[in-house]
């Protein structure tokens, strides 16, 4: 009996050491990927061809996404159907970087890092409310 108890304690010790060596998020697969904007430059304008699809994937109002992009890029523009037209020449790298920043600031939950969020307005303050964990965080105004 004493031998079995000693073996069990040794087994638990080895098991604890193995768990300490594992990373925190070992097999977590992300189900959300930041959508890429497909853009073309025509003259002095940049057209994001799939802007409506991008905003739908993010579950956000296209006007809100556009307002953020315009502010970050320092330009003017508008939405026409599924496209966004921006004044100026911007590469798809610049646009996709700004979309990634938008996702980090206005889509992903700051507590659980899930994209299951909605923007609500409480007492004249925009809040990011997570549907997964219930967390609420104030947002920067646009």
Curated annotation (Swiss-Prot):
Gene name as annotated: eif2b
* Name this polypeptide is given: Translation initiation factor 2 subunit beta
Q: Which GO terms describe its molecular function?
A: translation initiation factor activity
Say which family it is in: Belongs to the eIF-2-beta/eIF-5 family.
Describe its function: eIF-2 functions in the early steps of protein synthesis by forming a ternary complex with GTP and initiator tRNA.
Pfam hit, one: eIF-5_eIF-2B
Q: How does it assemble?
A: Heterotrimer composed of an alpha, a beta and a gamma chain.
Record keywords, A-Z: Initiation factor, Protein biosynthesis
């Amino acid at each position: 009996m004493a031998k079995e108890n000693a073996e069990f304690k040794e087994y638990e010790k080895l098991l604890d050491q193995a768990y300490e060596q594992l990373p925190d998020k070992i097999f977590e697969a992300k189900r959300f990927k930041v959508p890429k904007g497909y853009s073309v430059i025509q003259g002095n304008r940049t057209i994001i061809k799939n802007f409506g699809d991008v905003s739908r994937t993010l579950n956000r109002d296209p006007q809100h996404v556009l307002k953020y992009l315009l502010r970050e890029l320092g330009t003017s523009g508008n939405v026409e159907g599924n496209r966004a037209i921006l004044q100026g020449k911007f590469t798809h790298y610049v646009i996709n970087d700004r979309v990634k920043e938008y996702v980090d600031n206005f889509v992903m939950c700051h507590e659980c890092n899930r994209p299951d969020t909605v923007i609500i307005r409480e007492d004249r303050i925009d809040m990011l409310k997570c549907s997964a964990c219930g967390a609420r965080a104030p947002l920067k105004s646009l």
